[in-house]
Amino acid sequence: MTLSTENHTPFNQVHPNGSQQEATTENTSIPTQQEARILKSVSDLCAGKLKFKDLDKEIKNPFDAVLIRRAFLLVQCQGMNVRDTFSSDLPFENYDYSDVMETCCENAFGYIPVPVGLAGQLNVDGTTVYLPLATTEGALVASVSRGCKAINMSGGATTAITSDAMTRAPCLRLPSLSRAVEAKRWIESSEGFKALQDTFRQSSNHCRLIGVSVHVVGNHIYPRFQASTGDAMGMNMITHSIRNSISMMQNRFNDLEIISLSGNLCADKKPAAVNWVEGRGKGVIAQCRLSSVTMSNLLKTDAKQLAGLNTMKNHVGSAMAGASGGFNAQASNIVTAMYLATGQDVAQNVESSQCITTMEE
């Protein structure tokens, strides 16, 4: 298939299997209808007749849209070293792009396969579970499995959920400080809180407002809403409920202006003291008691050495680094690998891995 256009010179197309085919302007065979459509779309993209963002709407076949983007990228990157890296070696076949287009990924032109390792088994609250870990970091799965074995040998782990509230904090502006304080007092009053709770209940079958604290900065307010979201992470439902709540508030405060539905006091996907102190999402505590036999035979250490290491590394070392919630060894490694394997928002590992490891001899 020729990937050159009337506006661009020929180039070598490098295929995922490593072979190269010389693309020329001379037609050695009559292109298929699919190839003709792809070539015309690439030409239209290069000429500005077709907008990149409209490709999915114009091309009804999701896989054809992927081929067009890959061909377009090859044309645009002629002579650049990035060509082979970003297109030719990127897998794209054997994937159902209809599941992601206009849903969770724009401008798709391939996918990244990540190996998934199985860690465990692990005994948690009397139940045996396995941990799927998607990673390219050697020894991570083996390390986690070793930890699981140590916990199992000592009777398993017990857990407790201590808090359960997703948060979102919009930034709202009022014309003066006095109006901002008035809005704060109303939101935190029993009347205001009940009105907000009712709006949340009407907006979602699962999202329930359980608390709100309002921070005033000049004539701006940052109400930090806390809501239970059932088994879902819940960012969409809480954001939708807050949008409706603000509309309700504007009936009372007609000078209230939305600056942003997320004012960064949430705090979403960023290391923040407010998450460390007040929590965000589900707060979980896990506990296990390692036997001396396990520490000696499996971990090759003893309680005194292990507790001392935890103090000097995870507590003192982290404090010297100015860590915010990073008083652990590698929580983010495990959380990120599990999120990748289970299709969660990987960027949420920031607040999800904020934790402290404590040990007592």
Residue map of PLM features:
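Acidic/polar, glycine-rich intrinsically disordered N-terminal extensions of enzymes
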Residues: 1-138, 143-145, 150, 163
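Structured core elements
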Residues: 74, 119-123, 130-132, 171-173, ...
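Small-residue-rich
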Residues: 110-113, 117-218, 223-226
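Glycine-rich anion/phosphate-binding loop at the beta-strand->alpha-helix junction
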Residues: 231-361
